[in-house]
Amino acid sequence: MPSTYPRLSTLAQWSSAGPWQAELPHSCPHHALIWITRGQGRALIGGVRRGVGVHNALVIPAGTLFALDVGRQGFGLVFEIPPGGAALMPDEPQHLRLRDVQAQAELTAILDAMQREQNTARPFLDEAMNAHAALLSVWLRRTMIDHTDDRPARPTAAQRLVTAYAALIERDYRTGKPMADYAR
């Protein structure tokens, strides 16, 4: 259920209606940071399939077509951030493979603090969660700068085509257009 302030949940809580809820391509009205802490699997983000595993962070902007399958043994946290808030989130999906123990510890500490705050449900929870989201945003932008060498310099033509197609499907699927209209 979408919230007016950022929320943290486990992958199991996030897909509580069943694994299909995360495994089938869909989009969400809010930004999400997914932190995988156990297991491995596949993610489809913006039409591009990627392998995910332990210490991977996925940043999914609001309205991005995605699917996530980490299997039954997978575990992780999902931090959902409503768009238009204090936290600045990237416009493009990000897949960060955090090999540095310091970066892993920083992210874990931020998420642990969020979880403690959310579980105590004290007054001004919304303000506290927005402040934590802003801190996470700073950490994320710093980490993205540190990982610029990990990303390919330029996506291939096939990746650009499938990303554009996925964005078109996400934008127009509610209109009832037949598939033939998307092939033009």
Where are these regions (language model features)?
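A hydrophobic/aromatic-rich effector-binding and dimerization subdomain
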Residues: M1-L11, L65-A121, S137-D146
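Regular secondary-structure segments
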Residues: T37, T108-N119, A166, E170-Y173
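Short beta-strand His + acidic residue motifs that chelate non-heme Fe in jelly-roll/DSBH
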Residues: R42-L44, V52, I60, F66-G71
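Append "Primarily bacterial transcriptional regulators
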Residues: H55, D181-R184
